[in-house]
Amino acid sequence: MIGGRDAAAWIQPCLGTGALETTVEMMLLKKILRTPVVTEPLVRAESEEQVEVIGRQIDAWAQRVLGRSLHIREVDAGSCNGCELEIIALNNPYYDVERFGLHFVASPRHADCLLVTGPVTRNMADPLRRTYDATPEPKIVIAIGDCAIDCGVFAGGYGVIGPVSAVVPVDVIVRGCPPTPQTVLAGILAALQTHG
């Protein structure tokens, strides 16, 4: 019996249609039908209170160090985009970092902080240097993710020059593959504290 029905009742419509050609397929279908639903419970990795505390601290430190809100430019130096997804999540309604005065900007000329992801590839070394040079002081640079720190799985690849620190000075590293949005926020806070 499967779900209150005999397995034959589930399999019967498939017979004669060519859908179940071999006994292996038959056995697989029976196994699928006998296996109960297996899921892991939803675990909330971060609490709203922790995000709120870190966000308020970032806002206070930004006011202390810069006298205004923090403006961030994200730079993908050659990543797989896993870290970018976590950084982009900072703007979703759950984190909503705009309420803490964190603003993502399109131009490095308007940025106080660079979030750099991925190992630096040959094609991105010069653009990364120019982005760093265009950023006004205090030029806070945060290497986000394992690949930005030590090239991760891309280490030794032909197109990879090295970690972010080989191209521009790095103030803070944020470990993880990818790091969670809360970990990224903690890294931003640590960077502001080092400049304060």
Which stretches of residues belong to each language-model region?
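A short, gly/pro- and small-residue-rich
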Residues: P127-A143
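Short acidic low-complexity segments
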Residues: G101-H110
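Catalytic nucleophile loop
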Residues: K139-D150, C177
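Short glycine-rich anion-binding loops that position phosphate/pyrophosphate groups of nucleotides
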Residues: G78, P119-T121, C147-I149, P179
